[in-house]
Swiss-Prot record:
MF-aspect GO terms: L-lactate dehydrogenase activity; L-malate dehydrogenase (NAD+) activity
Catalytic reaction(s) noted: (S)-malate + NAD(+) = oxaloacetate + NADH + H(+)
Family: Belongs to the LDH/MDH superfamily. MDH type 3 family.
InterPro entries: L-lactate/malate_DH, Lactate/malate_DH_C, Lactate/malate_DH_N, Lactate_DH/Glyco_Ohase_4_C, Malate_DH_type3, NAD(P)-bd_dom_sf
Protein name per Swiss-Prot or TrEMBL: Malate dehydrogenase
Keyword Ion transport among record annotations: no
Organism: Geotalea daltonii (strain DSM 22248 / JCM 15807 / FRC-32)
Binding site residues for substrate: R83, R89, N121, R152
Length: 318
């Protein structure tokens, strides 16, 4: 049986890590595409030369022609300018929309049967554009945001409580921006509610526990900006790559994972016609199901606010 083919569009920081992780996990053969000649070839050669040490047989190729992504099973798009200090994800929209247009046309022409995972910012707008231009079914075009935002939230909870990140379940919904919605009510450490654990840590002081959680939420919402501020020359790339690979693996290996995915809603959660981060089952058919659950009044208000921000951003492209 032929190995799966993974096409990575954009040979920057995230693209390089994606190529390495795809190879390490033996997800399939990798084509790394970039418009800069030599860049994807150099990165893939460098990763491939580690194959005897890292013990993988996946073939890695660098490319400057969209024809080389022909027949890809899955395409992960990172192309676009990264954020710099002081910029919001939304500031990138005009430049990255032009890039996304040509990328989407390339995917439509050469990988018409592929699943597409978009990482490029501003995410909610870029994934909308990609689906519109490719014309692919919405089950095959999705955005990576929630997996990363949820991972950040879970990490901050684990560090606060001094527990293993493996045991923390936390989910973030909504848009990939400052209005994202961490679902505090269902956050737990192996089934034990996080709020209860924080209260116990602070000797039953409910007000203190709320204050601590508010700080964790705020840090989660600004986590991307925190990394940008420290790096000064770009934005996060290790964690976004890992998050996109989790999604790709769920599809390629038909894992039926329930993950927060930026998906096109058709009435779910009261939203129609917009890409928003919601829980989805990811498997061999891409987004196989959007999983709805009831939000309480506070969560609903935050979610509505987040959706309004997404609508404003997406509508600004029209």
């Amino acid at each position: 049986m032929a190995r799966k083919k993974i096409a990575l569009i954009g040979g920057g920081q995230i693209g390089g890590v994606l190529a390495q992780l795809s190879a390490l996990r033996e997800l399939g053969d990798v084509v790394l595409f970039d418009i800069v000649e030599g860049l994807p070839q150099g990165k893939t050669l460098d990763i491939a030369e580690a194959s005897p040490v890292d013990n993988f047989d996946a073939a890695l190729t660098g490319a400057n022609d969209y024809a080389d992504i022909k027949g890809a099973d899955i395409v992960i798009v990172t192309a676009g300018l990264p954020r710099k200090p002081g910029m919001s994800r939304d500031d990138l929209i005009a430049t990255n929309a032009k890039i996304m247009q040509s990328v989407s046309e390339g995917i439509k022409q050469y990988a018409p049967n592929s699943f597409v995972i978009v990482i490029s910012n501003p995410l909610d707008a870029m994934v909308t554009l990609c689906q519109k231009i490719t014309g692919f079914p919405s089950s095959r075009v999705m955005g990576m945001a929630g997996v990363l935002d949820s991972a950040r939230f879970a990490a901050f909870i684990a560090w606060e409580l001094g527990v293993s990140v493996k045991d923390v379940n936390a989910m973030v919904l909504g848009g990939h921006g400052d209005t994202m919605v961490p679902i505090i009510r269902y956050a737990n450490v192996n089934g034990v509610p996080v709020m209860e654990l924080i209260e116990r840590k602070y000797n039953g002081d409910k007000a203190k526990a709320k204050e601590v959680m508010a700080a964790l939420v705020k840090r989660t919402q600004g986590a991307g900006g925190e990394v940008v501020g420290l790096l000064k020359t770009g934005s996060a790339f290790y964690s976004p790559a890992s998050s996109a690979i989790a999604m790709a693996e769920a599809i390629l290996r038909d894992q039926k994972r329930l993950l927060p995915v930026c998906a096109l809603l058709n009435g779910e959660f009261g939203v129609k016609g917009y890409y928003v981060g919601v829980p989805c089952i990811l498997g061999a058919n891409g987004i196989e199901k959007i999983v709805e659950f009831s939000l309480d009044a506070e969560e609903q208000a935050m979610f509505d606010n987040s959706v309004a921000a997404v609508k404003e951003l997406v509508d600004s492209m029209k």
